[in-house]
Amino acid sequence: MRRYWVVIAVVTLGATGFLLRQAHQAHADSTSTGPSTTSSSTSTSMVTTTTLYRPAAVCVRVCSPWRVMDPWLHAVPSVLTTSFVPFPATPSVVAYAAWIRTSSTDLSLYPGYKGPGPTAAGVDRGPMMVPASGRPRLLATFNSGFYEADGAAGFYVNHTLYFPMVDGLATVVRYTNGRVDIIRWTGAARPGANIVMARQNLPLLVNASKPTPLSADNAAWGLTLGGVPAVWRTALGIDAQGNLIYAAAPSQTAASMAVVMTRLHVVRAMQLDINPEWPIFVTYGASGAIGATLFVPNPNQIPGRFLYSSTKDFFAVYASRRPGEAQPW
């Protein structure tokens, strides 16, 4: 595990201080403090050590380490990826996972020109792509959930309620304080003032770090191409430290996809889109959305998918400047 150090030094007589930090990362990171104080007639100094949280390698018979995808940012590593074989009995089936540090990123949601479904005349659907204003700090983009016609679900972003929230459904939310979570929705049809983004899709797939009982009912998790039970599936989870984990894998039932997410140590997870056409996770090699690369090797997708007008809604991950800031629009 790589360690990053934050050092605070205070010199009393010299009236000099300095602080080296990465903005607002600490609330989701594990820390250990070991103060060391030395005294003399001239100065006093205190050193505080902080260990930055990194996810452990994914180990299923063999261990698969995480790879940093945003070294060009020259800041806290915020998007890491790995691939692994979730079930040793089927070694040809590989799962692709991305870990997103929520304390140093902004998770944003964008409508496409078809999804979410038809809305009232005059409703602002936004840029329907990654806007130019956000591209200098764009780190990743990935697919969202079902069309509303395929599963009624709430959709809220940029102070606009495109579809009302549905009680009991799995919901990814971003709050005004910058925190992100995946929850079972128990609120009103319209999110409260402390929520800046909310997207629902079906019930929870994983809860309390275990597959939910409903995950065993494959018919409850969407129509599959050709009616086969095991298809490409994607999911989004939250770990115990409050960081997001996206995963995509072929040949999965709802139940096996839930197991994939538990192998990634999520506390809760929701299924996103399914079937071969939709899985996509893109990383970027430089500021300005340069060097777009498909992390999930889907021949039905292209790296620049969300840099142009998109049919379906999608998520974008930006390097954060301050907690809870409005997403680029």
Regions found by a protein language model. Name each.
Residues M1-V10:
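N-terminal Sec-pathway targeting helices
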Residues W5, G17-G34, M46-P164:
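Zymogen propeptides
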Residues T38, T44-S45:
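Duplex nucleic acid-engaging cores and interfaces of nucleic-acid transaction enzymes
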Residues P86-S92, T176, A240, S309:
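Short, ordered beta-strand-loop transition motifs
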Residues A95-W99, T171, L204, A235, ...:
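Conserved hydrophobic/aromatic beta-strand scaffold that supports enzyme active sites
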Residues Y110-R263:
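Aspartyl protease catalytic domain
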Residues I183, N207-A208, G222-W329:
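Extended C-terminal subregions enriched in glycine
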